[in-house]
Amino acid sequence: MMQDVSSSPVSPADDSLSNSEEEPDRQQPPSGKRGGRKRRSSRRSAGGGAGPGGAAGGGVGGGDEPGSPAQGKRGKKSAGCGGGGGGGAGGGGSSSGGGSPQSYEELQTQRVMANVRERQRTQSLNEAFAALPKIIPTLPSDKLSKIQTLKLAARYIDFLYQVLQSDELDSKMASYVAHERLSYAFSVWRMEGAWSMSASH
């Protein structure tokens, strides 16, 4: 019986069954490979989608991050520009500070010279006003201010002009020769009211 079974030929149905059983086993690895490819492709697509987004996010984050190299360079440049501006301002301050003592000294010298000129002018005026009462005939009771002294000098000049232009110049020339007599005549002329009238004008 064993010889019959071993020697019996295999039927085509059994071959087809065995082949059909082997074919699914052979076909399974390709399906697994395809699934792996799909999974890999899906992972790649997901990674690629995340990649640009991550790159974009990284780009934005890199722009916002203070420690990025680009911003560090910009910060250094701005700091350098600010330092240069500060240096320029410092230089301007030093130049102005160097020029300020000269201008201050010039102003001081100008003020001193102006004060000297004002003192000289005041001194000369005081000397002139002190000399006028010696020339103009005055009364012992006169306590004249500078303006009154000037008015009295103007009236004395007017009196002398009237004396010189009078019709009786020849007959009265001898009586007005001496300075004392002129002074007396002027004093009388003042007391008669001419001085008060001229002072009122």
Curated annotation (Swiss-Prot):
Keywords of this entry: Activator, Biological rhythms, Developmental protein, Differentiation, DNA-binding, Myogenesis, Nucleus, Repressor, Transcription, Transcription regulation
Any GO MF annotation of the entry: protein dimerization activity
Region ranges (Disordered): 1-106
Residues covered by region (Sufficient for transactivation activity): 162-190
GO CC field: nucleus
Compositional bias (Gly residues): 46-65, 80-100
Biased composition (Low complexity): 1-18
Subcellular location: Nucleus
Biased segments, Basic residues type: 34-43
Domain bHLH: 109-160
Gene3D superfamilies named among the record's database cross-references: Helix-loop-helix DNA-binding domain
InterPro entries to which the protein is assigned, alphabetical: bHLH_dom, E-box_TF_Regulators, HLH_DNA-bd_sf, TWIST1_bHLH
GO biological process per UniProt: cell differentiation; developmental process; muscle organ development; negative regulation of DNA-templated transcription; regulation of transcription by RNA polymerase II; rhythmic process
Function description: Acts as a transcriptional regulator. Inhibits myogenesis by sequestrating E proteins, inhibiting trans-activation by MEF2, and inhibiting DNA-binding by MYOD1 through physical interaction. This interaction probably involves the basic domains of both proteins. Also represses expression of pro-inflammatory cytokines such as TNFA and IL1B. Regulates cranial suture patterning and fusion. Activates transcription as a heterodimer with E proteins. Regulates gene expression differentially, depending on dimer composition.
Subunit and interaction comment: Efficient DNA binding requires dimerization with another bHLH protein. Homodimer or heterodimer with E proteins such as TCF3. ID1 binds preferentially to TCF3 but does not interact efficiently with TWIST1 so ID1 levels control the amount of TCF3 available to dimerize with TWIST and thus determine the type of dimer formed.
Protein name per its UniProtKB record: Twist-related protein 1
Gene this protein is translated from: TWIST1
